[in-house]
Curated annotation (Swiss-Prot):
Similarity-based family: Belongs to the bacterial ribosomal protein bS16 family.
Ranges annotated as biased composition (Low complexity): 111-120
Protein name stated in the entry: Small ribosomal subunit protein bS16
Lineage of the species this protein comes from: Bacteria, Pseudomonadati, Pseudomonadota, Alphaproteobacteria, Hyphomicrobiales
Residue segments, region Disordered: 84-120
Name of the gene: rpsP
Cysteines joined through disulfide linkages: none
The entry's keywords: Ribonucleoprotein, Ribosomal protein
Species, as recorded: Rhizobium rhizogenes (strain K84 / ATCC BAA-868) (Agrobacterium radiobacter)
GO molecular function, one term: structural constituent of ribosome
PANTHER family: 30S RIBOSOMAL PROTEIN S16, SMALL RIBOSOMAL SUBUNIT PROTEIN BS16M
Length: 120
């Protein structure tokens, strides 16, 4: 049984509230779960202490038993110091794409041609 530490949505329409739960990966998002280990209220201010509440001991227990946290839950665990999140680094993403580089080269060529024409 593949276990996940994930968010289950609660609350009402346009007023989200999430429970941090231990659930089988095959069960529905808001469906059956084994244990509730925390909560996240995104409606509260980011610096509010009650925005994210976690039961660190139970989460460590489930992590030791093979439960895998989802990306968002892993962020919460990293902030709480329960688990370490690897920093994603993609330096290639900041570079312009092939078409953008071609357009920049054409623009530079036109500027150089215009400068040469005015110099003559």
């Amino acid at each position: 049984m593949a276990l996940k530490i994930r968010l289950a949505r609660g609350g009402s329409k346009k007023r989200p509230y999430y429970h941090v739960v231990i659930a089988d990966a095959r069960s529905p998002r808001d469906g059956r779960f084994l244990e509730k280990v925390g909560s996240w209220n995104p409606m509260l201010a980011k610096d509010d202490a009650k925005r994210v509440e976690l039961d660190a001991d139970r989460i460590k227990h489930w992590l030791d038993n093979g439960a895998q946290p989802t990306d968002r839950v892993l962020r919460f665990l990293d902030e709480a110091g329960v688990a370490k999140r690897e920093v994603k680094s993609n330096p290639e993403k900041a570079k312009p794409g092939k078409r953008a580089q071609e357009r920049a080269a054409e623009k530079a060529q036109k500027a150089a041609d215009a400068a040469a024409a005015t110099a003559e």
